């Protein structure tokens, strides 16, 4: 998929910036402007050659649209805080299994997934450094107001949002 922007001050001219292989029907590549950073920077998800990352083969890319400078972050983003300081991240391969139109396929997949792992869920990633920490594991979400009917279900989240002051999040589980 081509990523770019329309210049509304120049006849709505489209400026292609980059191509991505991480795209889905409902959310595209999660392309977002980083309004909290200097200049005109955007972030989007992409496929990577990183086979040793948290989510092998997927990450995100920050691009300065004026200079063309790019840097890769180790996790794909779901939403970036309005401050542009951090992003919330999930496993798009899990989303592909649970809801194909909002996930990313992987070569040879989809593969079997743990139902509610302790070491995966919603991640908080610093946009400046790529450092990440797990905010809420699927195991914790499963245990919250536990329902036995969900014991054999694959747990996942969607509709993750950050409030305007970047101080709270919400999501559906």
Language model features: what each stretch is:
Residues 121-132, 162-164:
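A structural motif corresponding to the C-terminal end of an alpha-helix
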Residues 8-11, 64-68, 127-130:
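Short loop/turn segments that connect beta-strands within beta-propeller blades
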Residues 1-17, 152-173:
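Beta-propeller domains
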Residues 10, 36-38, 128-129, 165:
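Short strand-connecting beta-turns/loops that link adjacent beta-strands
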Residues 18-121, 134-151:
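Asp-box/WD-like beta-propeller blade repeats and closely related beta-sheet repeat scaffolds
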């Amino acid at each position: 998929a081509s990523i770019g922007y329309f210049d509304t001050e120049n006849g709505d001219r489209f400026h292609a910036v980059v191509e991505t292989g991480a795209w889905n029907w409902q959310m595209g590549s999660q392309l977002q402007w980083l309004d909290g950073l200097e200049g005109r920077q955007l972030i989007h998800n992409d496929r990577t050659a990183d086979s040793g990352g948290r989510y092998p083969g997927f990450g995100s890319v920050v691009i300065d649209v004026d200079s063309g400078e790019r840097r890769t972050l180790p996790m794909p983003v779901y939403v970036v805080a309005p401050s542009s300081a951090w992003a919330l991240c999930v496993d798009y391969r899990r989303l592909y299994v649970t809801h194909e139109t909002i996930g990313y396929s992987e070569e040879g997949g989809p593969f079997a997934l743990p139902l509610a792992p302790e070491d995966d869920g919603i991640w908080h990633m610093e946009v400046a450094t790529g450092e990440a920490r797990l905010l809420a594991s699927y195991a914790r979400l499963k245990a919250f107001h536990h329902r036995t009917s969900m014991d054999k279900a694959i747990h996942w989240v969607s509709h993750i949002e950050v409030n305007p002051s970047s101080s709270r999040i919400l999501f559906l589980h």
